[in-house]
């Protein structure tokens, strides 16, 4: 059994991790922690997330010193803020733990990226070099031996799963940048209360236009520029992305279908649509990314859906852990 610590367990993604790890036959939860200053310290996880009542009733322990929790721990999931993960990951790695970081602290191997988009100076360039980007369907060979796994962002997961096989397969005319219009549920903003996330304020609106940190994350890992516009939707969870691309001259519907099938035909957590396009309701609460598309002449529209808290966060983290330790890829997920 892998002794597993979940840091930042009080949040939405943290609670999903608790659920997955609790039912994993090869993992056992050693502790659930929050920051020492958290108002949730000392509370039961099931008091904050009643869906866990009678299933996981562990307390949220305040953590001020990593050494109090790292002894005999094999796996650490960091469901923490970017700056917090930046500081904690090196300490857990030094203690011999395998770290799965759900924040953006190690996703892009470029220190300037963090100063520009995250507002802090990255102190661990050697870890940026070592970190494996956990886009599970594409990086399994590197995940096998990784000790620091940077779980991709929610928007980048759906965008890259949609575009990577098309770009790698040479089907797109990249002189016209792919345009990604993405809408996420309010849970993507986290559990902390804010006026902008309140029931009466949320409608449907774009944000981070030309400035969102997920645009350079997507572009860096695709090796191609994209235009990315996120939107906040008036629903709790889920992401839907509509991606508009130009195909190279002569590329057919059948070629697009073939490239996607070759990429994901044996990947259990990506579901391809032979006809039509996905709807959000079919992935909420599930660990899948659903992908469908339509072609008209040289124009391609790809639609991808996922649960932002699952395939966009907790489920992908556990999927990466399964790959890392040689378990069935979908263990505890489906």
Curated annotation (Swiss-Prot):
Q: Where in the cell is it found?
A: Cytoplasm
User: GO BP, one example?
Assistant: L-arginine biosynthetic process
Q: Name one GO cellular component term.
A: cytoplasm
**The protein's enzyme class:** oxidoreductase
**Swiss-Prot/TrEMBL catalytic activity:** N-acetyl-L-glutamate 5-semialdehyde + phosphate + NADP(+) = N-acetyl-L-glutamyl 5-phosphate + NADPH + H(+)
Q: Where is the active site?
A: 154
Which pathway is recorded for this entry?
Amino-acid biosynthesis; L-arginine biosynthesis; N(2)-acetyl-L-ornithine from L-glutamate: step 3/4
EC no.? 1.2.1.38
Q: Which InterPro entries does the UniProt record give?
A: AGPR_AS, AGPR_type-1, NAD(P)-bd_dom_sf, NAGSA_dehydrogenase, Semialdehyde_DH_NAD-bd
Recorded GO MF terms? N-acetyl-gamma-glutamyl-phosphate reductase activity; NAD binding; NADP+ binding
Q: Which UniProt keywords apply?
A: Amino-acid biosynthesis, Arginine biosynthesis, Cytoplasm, NADP, Oxidoreductase
Q: Name one Pfam family in it.
A: Semialdhyde_dh
Read off the SMART domains from this record.
Semialdhyde_dh
- NCBIfam families listed in its UniProt record: argC
Name the family the entry cites: Belongs to the NAGSA dehydrogenase family. Type 1 subfamily.
**Summary of the function given for this chain in its UniProt record:** Catalyzes the NADPH-dependent reduction of N-acetyl-5-glutamyl phosphate to yield N-acetyl-L-glutamate 5-semialdehyde.
Protein name (Swiss-Prot/TrEMBL):
N-acetyl-gamma-glutamyl-phosphate reductase
Organism of provenance: Salmonella paratyphi A (strain ATCC 9150 / SARB42)
């Amino acid at each position: 059994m892998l002794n597993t610590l979940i840091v930042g367990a009080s949040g939405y993604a943290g609670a999903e991790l608790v659920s997955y790890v609790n039912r994993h036959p090869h993992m056992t939860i050693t502790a659930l922690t929050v920051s020492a200053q958290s108002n949730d310290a000392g509370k039961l996880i099931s008091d904050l997330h009643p869906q866990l009542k009678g299933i996981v009733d562990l307390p949220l322990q305040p953590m001020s010193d990593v050494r109090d929790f790292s002894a005999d721990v094999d796996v650490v999931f960091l469901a923490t803020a970017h700056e917090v993960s930046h500081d904690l990951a090196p300490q857990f790695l030094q203690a011999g733990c395998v770290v799965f970081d759900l924040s953006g602290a190690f996703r892009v191997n470029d220190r300037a990226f963090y100063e520009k988009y995250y507002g802090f100076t990255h102190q661990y360039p050697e870890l940026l070099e070592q970190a494996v980007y956990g886009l599970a369907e594409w990086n399994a060979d590197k995940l096998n031996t990784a000790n620091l796994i940077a779980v991709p962002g929610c928007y980048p997961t759906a965008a890259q799963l949609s575009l990577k096989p098309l770009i790698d397969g040479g089907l797109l005319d990249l002189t016209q940048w792919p345009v990604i219009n993405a809408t996420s549920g309010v849970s993507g903003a986290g559990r902390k209360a804010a006026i902008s996330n309140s029931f009466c304020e949320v409608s449907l609106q774009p944000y981070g236009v030309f400035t969102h940190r997920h645009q350079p994350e997507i572009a860096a890992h695709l090796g191609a520029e994209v235009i990315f516009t996120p939107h906040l939707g008036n629903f709790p969870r889920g992401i839907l992305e509509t991606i508009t691309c130009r195909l190279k001259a002569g590329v057919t519907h059948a070629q697009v279908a073939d490239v996607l099938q070759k990429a994901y035909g044996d990947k259990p957590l990506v579901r391809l649509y032979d006809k039509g396009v996905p709807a959000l309701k079919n992935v909420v609460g599930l660990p899948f990314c659903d992908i469908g598309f339509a072609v008209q002449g040289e124009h391609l529209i790809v639609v991808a859906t996922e649960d932002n808290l699952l395939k966009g966060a907790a489920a992908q983290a556990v999927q990466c852990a399964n790959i890392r330790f040689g378990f069935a890829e979908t263990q505890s997920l489906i």
